[in-house]
């Protein structure tokens, strides 16, 4: 959640001044999965409530994240940029990420979050009931 909020505060709200809505394309697994209460609670409290945004999250099912336009356009370029090079430190990884570009001029911006996150954070049923969540009618399989 820190990265989404940081992006909104440093880039998004300036680039999209009158935006009241944010769409996030997310992989279906990991910490931002569609079943993650921590992810949903964080989006509501840290992005929606704090910044007055409505957020739609489109989760890609397992094995389909390659259709995410960012992954589709950038990951192959990142892989080519750091191919056969030892990724032996965060600084090295960030260097290769930041120097990746596409032929159309798309660039990668990357920063390291050094925050130590707590493990086992639980969001209660009561906390979930407070959230303003709506599932889309069409949820393709």
Model-inferred region functions:
Residues 1-24:
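Short, basic/hydrophobic alpha-helical segments
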Residues 1-6, 32-39, 86:
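Phosphate/oxyanion-binding active-site loops and adjacent basic polyanion-contact surfaces
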Residues 21-28, 57-62, 96-97:
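Extended hydrophobic secondary-structure segments that form protein cores and membrane-embedded regions
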Residues 26-39, 61-67:
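Acidic, metal-coordinating catalytic cores used for nucleic-acid/nucleotide bond scission
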Residues 38-43, 73-77:
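Short secondary-structure boundary/capping segments
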Residues 39-57:
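Two-metal-ion acidic nuclease core segments, chiefly of the RNase H-like superfamily
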Residues 57-79:
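RNase H-like two-metal-ion nuclease catalytic core shared by retroviral integrases
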Residues 84-141:
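C-terminal accessory extensions appended to soluble enzyme cores
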């Amino acid at each position: 959640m820190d990265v989404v909020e940081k992006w909104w505060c440093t880039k998004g709200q300036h680039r999209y001044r009158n935006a009241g809505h944010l769409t996030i394309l997310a992989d279906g697994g990991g910490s931002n999965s569609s079943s993650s209460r921590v992810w949903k609670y964080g989006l509501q409290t840290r992005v929606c409530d704090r910044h007055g945004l409505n957020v739609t999250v489109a989760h890609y099912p397992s094995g389909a994240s390659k259709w995410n336009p960012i992954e589709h356009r950038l990951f192959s370029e990142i892989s080519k940029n750091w191919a056969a090079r030892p990724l032996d430190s965060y600084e090295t990884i960030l260097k290769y990420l930041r120097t990746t570009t596409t032929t159309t001029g798309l660039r990668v911006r990357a920063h390291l979050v050094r925050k130590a996150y707590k493990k086992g954070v639980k969001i209660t049923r009561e906390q979930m009931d407070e959230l303003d969540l709506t599932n889309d009618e069409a949820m393709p399989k």
